[in-house]
Curated annotation (Swiss-Prot):
It catalyses: L-homoserine + acetyl-CoA = O-acetyl-L-homoserine + CoA. The gene is metAA. The record marks S192 as: Important for substrate specificity. NCBIfam families: metA (TIGR01001). GO terms for cellular component: cytoplasm. Its main location: cytoplasm. It is found in: Cytoplasm. It is an enzyme of class 2 (transferase). It comes from Bacillus cereus (strain G9842). This is Homoserine O-acetyltransferase. Belongs to the MetA family.
Length: 301
């Protein structure tokens, strides 16, 4: 089923080439079913790439989604054209009196800072507090997951000696959880981060349930408030070449960066990446939308 996005959004052409069903607002308004209102708080500097990654996954479901892109009013984005933000994005102030079926909070390249040092932390806290009563379910990704775990439950993050960078095997910790419907007991997901949250801290919080963990990469999936809050420490939304682009960017800057683990064929960066997370990435997003958004949200928000 389709997702509703602005007809001029650049990601639209990318998605149409991949046979992701997108629809204009004009066409959607002639249908009798209600679209799910999904907000994406995009904290990434690579906004257009992140848009395409997330829309690709949430668009691969039998649901009609009305997508609203959000950016932080208290932060100036240097890596994206301001006319793109003005044309396609709203701020929290624009939507704070509305309710949403779902909210996605992305990662951000600020993890080496303490949460309180991030220039938009106060605004993000207001959004996370708002989500508790105005959003049916919120999916937090990578740093967004660390921020959510810290704000809602006081779970700290810890610096890593080396960047967690690559594609890692994970094991399902809890059976018969709707978010993991259709998951294999072992599955892969990319990680790209300099900090971690620890299993011991998660297990100390009775309101949280650890769903998937990795011996090498650590905590990946956590759920709270019976699905009103979902935390994904990895990047199941990543495209095939995202880790490759990150590696080449840092290498070209002269940074000390290792080749992403378990990613390139024969671990050779001159060969193509091996995608081993795509099916479970689609499952993660479709299960979240189906079981924790669509099945739980009221018809009238």
């Amino acid at each position: 089923m389709p997702i509703i996005i602005d007809k001029d959004l650049p990601a639209r052409k990318v998605l149409q080439k991949e046979n992701i069903f997108v629809m204009t607002k004009e066409r959607a308004e002639t249908q009798d079913i209600r679209a799910l209102k999904i907000a994406i708080l995009n904290l990434m500097p690579t906004k257009q790439e992140t848009e395409a990654q997330l829309l690709r996954l949430i668009g691969n479901t039998p649901l009609q989604l009305d997508v609203h892109l959000l950016h932080m009013e208290s932060h100036f984005s240097r890596n994206v054209a301001q006319d793109h933000l003005m044309s396609f994005y709203k701020t929290f102030r624009d939507i704070e009196n509305e309710k949403f079926d779902g909210l996605i909070i992305t990662g951000a390249p600020v993890e080496t800072l303490s949460f309180e040092e991030v220039d938009y932390w106060e605004e993000l806290k207001r959004i996370m507090e708002y989500s508790k009563t105005n959003v049916t379910s919120t999916l937090h990704i990578c740093w967004g997951a660390q921020a959510g775990l810290y704000y809602h439950y006081g779970v700290p993050k810890y610096p890593l000696k080396e960047k967690m960078f690559g594609v890692f095997e994970h094991e399902v910790c809890e059976q018969h959880v709707k978010l993991l419907q259709g998951f294999d007991e072992l599955f892969f997901a990319p990680h790209s981060r300099h900090t971690e949250v620890r299993e011991s801290d998660i297990r100390e919080v009775t309101e949280l349930t650890l769903l998937a963990n990795s011996e090498e990469a650590g905590v990946h999936l956590v759920i709270g408030q019976e699905g009103r809050q979902v935390f994904a420490l990895g990047h199941s939304e990543y495209s095939c070449d995202t880790l490759k682009q990150e590696y080449e960017r840092d290498r070209d800057k002269g940074l000390n960066i290792d080749v992403p683990k378990n990613y390139f064929k024969h671990n050779n960066p001159d060969e193509k990446p091996l995608v081993r997370w795509r099916s479970h990435g689609n499952l993660l997003f479709s299960n979240w939308l189906n079981y924790y958004v669509y099945q739980e949200t009221p018809y009238i928000l």
